[in-house]
From Swiss-Prot:
NCBIfam families: argG, PRK00509.1. This is Argininosuccinate synthase. ATP binds at residues 9-17, 35, 114-122. Its EC number is 6.3.4.5. One of its GO terms (biological process) is L-arginine biosynthetic process. L-aspartate binds at T118, N122, D123. Pathway: Amino-acid biosynthesis; L-arginine biosynthesis; L-arginine from L-ornithine and carbamoyl phosphate: step 2/3; Nitrogen metabolism; urea cycle; (N(omega)-L-arginino)succinate from L-aspartate and L-citrulline: step 1/1. One of its GO terms (cellular component) is cytoplasm. It comes from Anopheles gambiae. Keywords: Amino-acid biosynthesis, Arginine biosynthesis, ATP-binding, Ligase, Nucleotide-binding, Urea cycle. It comes from the Eukaryota. The keyword Transport does not apply. Belongs to the argininosuccinate synthase family.
Amino acid sequence: MSKEKVLLAYSGGLDTSCILKWLLEQDYEVICFMADVGQTEDFAAAREKALKIGAADVVVKDMKDFFVEKFVWPAVQMGLIYEDRYLLGTSLARPCISKGLMDVAVQRGCSYISHGATGKGNDQIRFELSCYALSPTIRVIAPWRMETFCQRFQGRSDLLEYAKRSNIPVSATTKAPWSMDANIMHISYESGILEDPSVAAPEELYQLTQSPTRAPDTPTVAEIVFKAGLPVRVTELVSGRTMERPVDILAFLNKAGGEHGVGRIDIVENRYIGLKSRGVYETPGVTVLHCAHRDLEIYCLDREVLRVKKYLADRMADYVYNGYWYAPEAEYVRKCILESQKHVSGKVVVEMFKGHVMVTSRESMHSLYNQELASMEVHGNFSPYSSTGFIEINAVRLREHHRVFGTANMTKHFSRTESDMKLI
């Protein structure tokens, strides 16, 4: 009787290597899957390690272009920022990796998938919801949520002992006092010493960006061209170097922004499962793109459309963070936001300098900015006398509020009691 097949999302690290061995002990045939989304990984060494442990095969899939074009670029186009700060680098990678994982699972006839995500994190949710949306009949083995596995492996020391007994190669390098997840879009850091929010992240943690205090004294200036909200070309203005391929654009902006310390954030965020967590993120290139895209949006879109679009983008950011990239509500909101991007085309010049990115100019054939109307030098077609009636109409409710609540309300507003001062 043939063994049931499991496709394991494999990283080559201690956790998934031990899970691979443990699955083999449970009498499964295990195929390992690795997605190359731009992380610094020795895939050849990881493949050799998995085969040595006992994997039936190792599939390594280059997904960098797919990730940037189908996930990162749409996220910029939609303006997705979770809780107004996190640019979703890890969250976007999970549905991308899940797509590759499920494609291989179907091709290789796997009844199960397995992963090494912990039971407290967001990744377990993102992976599994994405996989169920793509293949409803797939079954999931999540060892870190299984009582027998968790009782056997209480932590890293138990895994190391198991690896030693099972002849699983373990890296001799000292483990960093934090965990890291990297891809072509960003690097995230959490856990370890970062679990104390009062402790500042050490400078040696950062790998994509250097401290703004050590940044060059000359700014890097680039022109970014957008078409329907998507970046299509970037030109470094000093050298004239031009990039059009999405991964090349992102690589250039990561390097240029990183040299100036652009895109560092240290935040506490709300996980979907209800916990708060502290994360440190480096996202230089996409930080630059978001800045340029937002500026062009304001230049080209109606004010009320912008407000509705911002509301929808916030909802979509929640969907992505929580693992619902492939959900019907996300698909619906995506289509609504894309309607707003039809005229977000033009070019934006940005200046990256010592931790900051600033837009210095913008041009678009679809701009709603009317220089003659906006000018303080000429009246143009705008009658300043019309403002009198506008002010009068908008003052009606304020006058009525004062008529009813009047002096007593104002006295309370401007008074300060001793207890009030203690709160300030």
